[in-house]
Structures are given as structure tokens and as C-alpha cells.
């Protein structure tokens, strides 16, 4: 059989019809007039959200029957200006009912007659002076100046300290200047020799590192009753001494290195001295020390005596080696100061005072090839006597030295 070919058959012309696409927003009257080039088939409704879900005023199609609101139909409220507020000048003045000046002003108005001036030219240039002020004579230069800046506590303490010498009757300008910084505090307080000695001991204790309770001393010195008792007790013991002994003590203190500001009487008061301009080095010769036992009364106690008492009872006692063991010979220079001269060469090797006790056994490394690495701080004795050279007088070695040397050799073995 022959295969049948498919054929396309077109209907006749009278059966053909024309199909047009239009937008739903367009009115039906405009469908036929517009060109169909831009028209497309509508997409499926499932891809677009429904317009019914949109709130009013957020787009969406307007129906033809919906009425549009005109702005002219909206009623408008006429704006009226507010009432103008007029401020009264009397409102700006505070009455001050609780002020005390109100009563004074009312009494003044009742006492003074009211005056009326017809014109501005008749008004006096100056106000009326109150009756209680007319008879008073006040000078504006004597008005007390009130400082605006706050005054610090340190400034008050410094001012009060500077006022002490003037209150006690001692002129500060007449006293000689003090070169030592440690005794500078003692010249600013108007007290007796006991207080001066205590202050010098406090200043020395700061440098020496002693255990003196400075707060207790300050409390004692700040209490005037305790100070009077101390001065009375000490004054009874030193009342026998005369002015000559005080002058002698001041000269001896300068020789010992203690600087005194002014001579001290038996009452514990200071006497002003004339200003010292320049004294030559050999202006006076000090008294011989053998003249001191001639006085029947005991010598006046200086600041060093009280300083030693405080160091013995209030803190650690720091002993200083005597002068004769230092190997120095003191010769007074023309200026009065000591002139140290070396008289013993062995003092160059002098070791400082050991704080720990040494062991009596000799050090086995001393004077050996290895040597002692501790040096002067070694706990054992460094005795060089067994190694002294031969005696030049008889050419022999001491037998005791030989025995000591043998013992040290056995100890090393």
C-alpha cells in the first residue's frame, strides 16, 4: 500500500475570523483604534500577586466607577494669630518678701519725706546721704582686702613659722647665718636649749637612720605644758651657771664643730647679737682647756649632750671610734679648722668595722697562691704576722712565728 501523506487543509475565506488582543485597563472603545504591535498575550495570573491584597492608596487598578476626591472639596481651617502677650515691667522686678532689706527700705521710706521734682534739671546729681553715715569718717584705703584665691595649708604653716622669731623678741636679721643644713630648723623656733637640742637630734636621726620616734617628739614639743616642765626641770640644774659659762660654752662648741646661733642665758632665753660683717681668722684665741676645772659650777650642757641622750634611750646607739685611734694629728689652721696629717701609714689598710663576729680560726686561703675571694668580708681571721720578713737587727726569725707558720701548714694539709 502506498503511504498516505498528511495534508493541511485551510478553511474557506468566509469561515476565517480575526482575533485581537487588548489590555484590561483600556476601555473597550479604544481597543480598535490603537495599533496591535505592542500588544502581547497576558501572562498567567499565578505569577503576579493579586491586587486585592494591596491596601488602598498603594497602587492597584482604579475602576472606572470609582469617584476621585478633589482638593477643593476638602474643608480648610482658617488660621488665626494668637493674642499678643504684653510683658509688664513690674514683672521683671523681684519683690523679695523674705529679704531683710525690705524692712529696712520700708523704715527708710517712713523716715524720709517723699520729694517731688518738677523736672529732670531739678534732680540732684548725688543721692541723699543717710543720717547714720553723715557723722562717720571712713577711709577707703583701710578697707580689708578679701583674697579670692584659696590659701593652701602649706602657706599658712610657712607664715606661722616665720612669725615665731618676731614674737619672741629676737631679730632675725641680727643673727648670724647658719651654714649647716641640719641646724637650720633650730634657728626658727623660739624655745629653750632643750627644744633646740631635740630638734637637732631629730634632724640628725634622719641622716643616721636611727629608730627615734619622731612623732612622739613632735607631740611633746607641740604641747606647751610639757615643754615648760622640761625647761623648768633642766633650768633648776643649770641655774648656777653664769653668763661667762654660756659664752665659754658657745666658743667651745664652735671648736668642736657645733654651730650656735646666739648665746643662751640660764633662763633659756635668746639675746640678740649685733650683725657680724667679717671677722679675721686670728681675731681671738680660744681659752685653754685646763681653765675649765677652775669653775665650781658644772659646765652648761650643749646640744650634743641631749643628742647623745636621745640616741642612748630612744634609738640605736652608733658608736664612733675615738679620734686618737684614727692615726691623724690635728693642727689648728689660721681659719680655725682642723688640718689632718697622716702619721701612720698602716691606716691606709684599715678595714671598716665588721657587723658580724669573726671566727678565731685563721683563713686557709689567705696569703696563698689561690687567695681568699672574700677579702675583708671573710669570716675567718686574716693574720699576716707569720709571714713577716726576717728581723734586720739580729738576722733571725722569731721562734713563735715559726711555730704559728707550722701550725697553719698542718691545718692546710
Curated annotation (Swiss-Prot):
Disulfide feature: none
Molecular function in Gene Ontology: DNA binding; zinc ion binding
Zinc fingers classed as C3H1-type: ranges: 357-385
Ranges annotated as biased composition (Polar residues): 176-189, 389-403
Keyword Kinase: no
Annotated spans, Disordered: 28-61, 159-191, 333-356, 389-413
Zinc-finger found in the keyword field: yes
Top-level lineage group: Eukaryota
Keywords: DNA-binding, Metal-binding, Zinc, Zinc-finger
Protein name stated in the entry: Zinc finger CCCH domain-containing protein 6
